[in-house]
Amino acid sequence: YIEMLVDRGVAGIIFVSGRHADTTGDVTRYQRLRERGVPLVTVNGNAPTIKAPGFATDDRRATRMAVDHLIALGHQRIGLAMGPMRMVPAQRKRSGYEDAMREGLPQEPLRIVETLYTYEGGISAALHLLEQGCTGIVCSSDVMALGVVHGVRQTGRSVPHDVSVIGYDDSPLIPMTDPPLTTVRQPVGSICRAAVSTLLAQLDGERPTDTEMLFAPDLIVRDSTAAAFID
């Protein structure tokens, strides 16, 4: 598809959540575009080998905020349901989780499950993390978090009375879930505006810098998190 776009005279390309975020991926396509003088920018994570302007949510900061919220509620056994580790956003989320746990709960082991960004992946992660005694679970996507909620209920527990769950994205329907999901809101509008303006600047002849700009997220607290239940 990329070659087709170039052959049809596309002026520039914005890549969103593509192979540019995969640390094991083939970056040849991006190198060829640069060699051909096609302006490009990326959104949602740049692997170290990618040489292009990038724009993304500060995933490390986001996950740290989520874990800190659970710690403030009295949770100690906190788990992370994350996506494939080869992806840059997953690596950053794991780093944020590790930072928060080591600073706030240094006596607790890290409880991490790598799974898919799917409802089914969330269910699987929930079952594994509940076996480890987790009372709080941070997820790498809202869809995954909904799967975690289902997995918690499969075991006869409830959210948030027994287990608190935090999502990631703040998708449009999330406030209407049962319970309404506490989640990380990405500044999508700001990221998109910056990506487009940078691409337009390249089209006007401005030389790009191969740096990545990270945007601050917000933690939106709803009803899927509560104080840790004490027997």
Task: Go through each PLM region and give its residues.
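Bacterial carbohydrate/catabolite-sensing allosteric modules
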Residues: 4-12, 21-231
